[in-house]
């Protein structure tokens, strides 16, 4: 055989391919062998009886409807059928011919279909247009042939008309129901069958579909109870394993979105892969629960409750057409009244004399034997008892450090503004065209909103819809005062009523000023009379015949040498000194006589 030299200078021998018989369809590559476990006879079941203990008695059967041709080659595989009547399949019913279970598992490589010998163009038959045999949905039994099918196949010509040969050395039996449509071998087998079929091929009259029928056995109470017990035990063990299992988180994305409070301790951080930036995330719901977790949770709950209460107050103010601060003021007044009632009740209560006032100094007590001793009870002061008595009417609050968290918006005066409805916007533009930019009048239409909020809404609308604002301001509407009073739900009155009230106020003011002048004059007269009486009483004669005014003048110039007490003390000291000298002289005289 001559060799060929390619462009690179490499000499190689061409491959020799054997000739194939001409076929009517397009040539297709040989697909991978689908692996099915099909028991051939009872002898194989007896040889493998040790492996059949856990398998159910009901087995699936591959049944082929009678066809005109006893043997048909399919991409290198031989499938045999019988020429029986349709009554053989009719006994099973329509339920038995089920489709393939999509959730079954892929079987192991136990059995392969027998490759068919190559056929000539004369012997080649038109391939069947039916799809591959569907598999049963029942996973409780393994495939098996029906007796009629096995008998007919055994009577056919030789071993070439058998479906497949099965090895006696089977390591393990696997159910056919575990084959899924996702099996790669099955998919390639189907694809090559479709590609190998010619477009002009027609389904012959005797061609029938090969279907796998599962035998349905009636359930028993024992099997159902056993299955339930096994399932419950498996679920309980799986739950216990899940409860005791710990998880290692290597990325922030691996953290579950919803983690229960009790399960957060099961998640651990991979210290080698985690960075400080990831650890500084604001929400990191894994790890051991600290002591402050419950406090923060309670603070968050209280914050949401307060927010809900304010929302209800705003809704109530909108419905009752009242300002929001009036509702809050009513609540504050009610709380203050309750505190006053509790305080008055405590003050009017009868408190024992011992509890009324605590002793500030150590006291003495008389013992039964007549001796005096220190009262030990007065040496101890119970401040908590005194505080509880004095502050019993006050409200006791346990402070939570997480309740009042401060940020850049904590010290601002901004309040939440409810969104404006369509009716409010219509009223707003109508008021603009009627009253202009007098926001004091416009804010009366919205008592549950402040003037600041109305002005902010005007500025916002002027930015978003300047044309509408310009049209509303230029198209002046005639002011309707009665309609305005009806909308604000107030009776302002007419100009005549206003003038009458003004005259009444002026008269009251004049009368009040007259009363003030009269009070000033009477007070001035009283001061003058009191001054005259004081002057008359001051300038009187004293005990020495000197007037009080002259005595004051003399006392300003006199010098004080001492007081009477000082003179008495001085005289007493002199007497004592004289007595001491007399005593000393009397003691010296007897000594001289001796």
UniProtKB/Swiss-Prot annotation:
InterPro entries assigned to the protein according to its UniProt record, in alphabetical order: Bdp1_fungi (IPR017174), Homeodomain-like_sf (IPR009057), SANT/Myb (IPR001005), TFIIIB_B''_Myb (IPR039467)
UniProt subcellular location: Nucleus
Subunit note: TFIIIB comprises the TATA-binding protein (TBP), the B-related factor (BRF) and the B'' component (BDP1). Interacts with TFC4.
Native species: Saccharomyces cerevisiae (strain ATCC 204508 / S288c) (Baker's yeast)
Domain of life of the source: Eukaryota
Residue spans of biased composition, Acidic residues class: 579-594
All copies of domain SANT, residue ranges: 415-466
Function according to Swiss-Prot or TrEMBL: General activator of RNA polymerase III transcription.
Protein name per Swiss-Prot or TrEMBL: Transcription factor TFIIIB component B''
Keyword Amino-acid biosynthesis: no
Record-level GO cellular component terms: nucleoplasm; transcription factor TFIIIB complex
Polar residues bias (residue ranges): 150-168
GO BP terms in the entry: DNA-templated transcription open complex formation; regulation of DNA-templated transcription; regulation of transcription by RNA polymerase III; RNA polymerase III preinitiation complex assembly
Family as reported in the entry's similarity comment: Belongs to the TFC5 family.
Presence of keyword Transcription: yes
Chain spans, region Disordered: 1-169, 217-245, 317-343, 520-547, 567-594
Sequence ranges of Basic and acidic residues compositional bias: 225-241, 317-330, 520-529
């Amino acid at each position: 055989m001559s060799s060929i030299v390619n462009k690179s200078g490499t000499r190689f021998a061409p491959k020799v391919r054997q000739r194939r018989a001409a076929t009517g369809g397009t040539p297709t590559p040989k697909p991978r062998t689908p692996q099915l476990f099909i028991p051939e006879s009872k002898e194989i079941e007896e040889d493998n009886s040790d492996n059949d203990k856990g398998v159910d008695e009901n087995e699936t059967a591959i049944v082929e409807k009678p066809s005109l041709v006893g043997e048909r080659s399919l991409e290198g595989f031989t499938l045999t059928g019988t020429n029986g009547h349709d009554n053989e399949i009719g006994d099973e019913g329509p339920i038995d011919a089920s489709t393939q279970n999509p959730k079954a598992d892929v079987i192991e490589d136990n059995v392969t279909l027998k490759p068919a010998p190559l056929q000539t163009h004369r012997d080649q038959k038109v391939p069947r247009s039916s799809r591959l045999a569907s598999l049963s949905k029942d996973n409780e039994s393994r495939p098996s042939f029906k007796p009629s099918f096995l008998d007919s196949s055994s009577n056919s010509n030789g071993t070439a008309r058998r479906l497949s040969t099965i090895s006696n050395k089977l390591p393990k039996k696997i159910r056919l129901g575990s084959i899924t449509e996702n099996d790669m071998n099955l998919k390639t087998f189907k694809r090559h069958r479709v590609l190998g079929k010619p477009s002009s091929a027609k389904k012959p009259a005797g061609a029938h579909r090969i279907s796998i029928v599962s035998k349905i056995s009636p359930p028993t109470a024992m099997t159902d109870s056993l299955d339930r017990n096994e399932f419950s035990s498996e679920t309980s063990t799986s739950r216990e394993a899940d409860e005791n299992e710990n998880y290692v988180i290597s990325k922030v994305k691996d953290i579950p979105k919803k983690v229960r409070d009790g399960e957060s301790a099961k998640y651990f951080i991979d210290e080698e892969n985690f960075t400080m930036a990831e650890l500084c995330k604001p929400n990191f719901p894994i790890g051991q629960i600290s002591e402050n977790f419950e406090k923060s949770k309670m603070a968050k709950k209280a914050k949401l409750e307060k927010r809900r209460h304010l929302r209800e107050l705003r809704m109530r103010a909108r419905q009752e057409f009242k300002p929001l601060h009036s509702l809050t003021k009513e609540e504050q007044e009610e709380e203050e009244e309750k505190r006053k009632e509790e305080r008055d009740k405590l003050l009017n209560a009868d408190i024992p004399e011992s509890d009324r006032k605590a002793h500030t100094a150590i006291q003495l007590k008389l013992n039964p034997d007549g001796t005096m001793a220190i009262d030990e009870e007065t040496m101890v002061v119970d401040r908590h008892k005194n505080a509880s008595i004095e502050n019993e009417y006050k409200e006791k609050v346990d402070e939570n450090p997480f309740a009042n968290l401060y940020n850049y918006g904590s010290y601002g005066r901004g309040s939440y503004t409810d969104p404006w409805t369509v009716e409010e916007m219509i009223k707003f533009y109508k008021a603009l065209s009627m009253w202009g930019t007098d926001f004091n009048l416009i804010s009366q239409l919205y008592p549950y909103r402040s003037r600041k909020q109305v002005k902010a809404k005007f500025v916002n609308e002027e930015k978003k819809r300047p044309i509408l604002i310009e049209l509303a301001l230029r198209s002046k509407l005639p002011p309707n005062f009665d309609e305005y009073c009806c909308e604000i739900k107030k009776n302002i009155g007419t100009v005549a009523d206003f003038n009458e009230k003004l005259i009444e106020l002026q008269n009251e003011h004049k009368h009040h000023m007259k009363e003030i002048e009269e009070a000033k004059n009477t007070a001035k007269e009283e001061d003058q009379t009191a001054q005259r009486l004081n002057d008359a009483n001051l300038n009187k004669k004293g005990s020495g015949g000197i007037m009080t005014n002259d005595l004051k003048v003399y006392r300003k110039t006199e010098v004080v040498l001492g007081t009477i007490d000082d003179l008495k003390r001085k005289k007493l000291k002199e007497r004592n000194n004289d007595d001491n000298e007399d005593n000393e002289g009397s003691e010296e005289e007897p000594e001289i006589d001796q």
